[in-house]
């Protein structure tokens, strides 16, 4: 490989690293909401999986504790899936053209 090609690859890698850092910062600001029980339980989190809010409809507080725990878990899982999908969508443009294996998830 010639020096010019190597320098070009290094510059491209550095630019991608800077872009990834910016995208990571943006993902920390994007919020998604997961729901369960027809919206009676909601979990709001960032695309970096930081939970911001948990909302439980007061009508559930008198109900079965086990059911409420299941609804909270389901809402959390829904939020995680939405955060992952949003992150993949946002990162997709940055990784197009890279020979990444199928199912490879970014950010790392």
UniProtKB/Swiss-Prot annotation:
GO cellular component: bacterial nucleoid; cytosol
DNA-binding recorded as keyword: yes
Domain of life: Bacteria
GO MF annotations, alphabetized: DNA binding
Compartments, as annotated in UniProt: Cytoplasm, Nucleoid
Pfam families, per database record: YbaB_DNA_bd
Keywords (A to Z) from UniProt: Cytoplasm, DNA-binding
InterPro entries: YbaB-like_sf, YbaB/EbfC
Biased composition (Pro residues): 99-108
Protein's UniProt keywords contain Zinc-finger: no
Segments of this protein annotated with the region Disordered: 87-108
Described purpose of this protein according to its UniProt entry: Binds to DNA and alters its conformation. May be involved in regulation of gene expression, nucleoid organization and DNA protection.
Family to which this protein belongs: Belongs to the YbaB/EbfC family.
Subunit structure: Homodimer.
PANTHER family: NUCLEOID-ASSOCIATED PROTEIN YBAB
Name of the protein: Nucleoid-associated protein Bxeno_A2072
């Amino acid at each position: 490989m010639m020096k010019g090609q190597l320098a070009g690859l290094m510059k491209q890698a550095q630019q991608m690293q800077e872009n990834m850092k910016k995208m990571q910062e943006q993902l920390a600001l994007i919020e998604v909401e997961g729901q369960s029980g027809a919206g009676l339980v909601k979990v709001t989190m960032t695309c970096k999986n930081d939970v911001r809010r948990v909302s439980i409809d007061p009508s559930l507080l008198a109900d079965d504790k086990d059911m409420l725990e299941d609804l909270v878990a389901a809402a959390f899982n829904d939020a995680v899936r939405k955060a992952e999908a949003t992150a993949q969508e946002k990162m997709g443009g940055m990784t197009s053209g890279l020979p990444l294996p199928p199912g490879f998830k970014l950010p790392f």
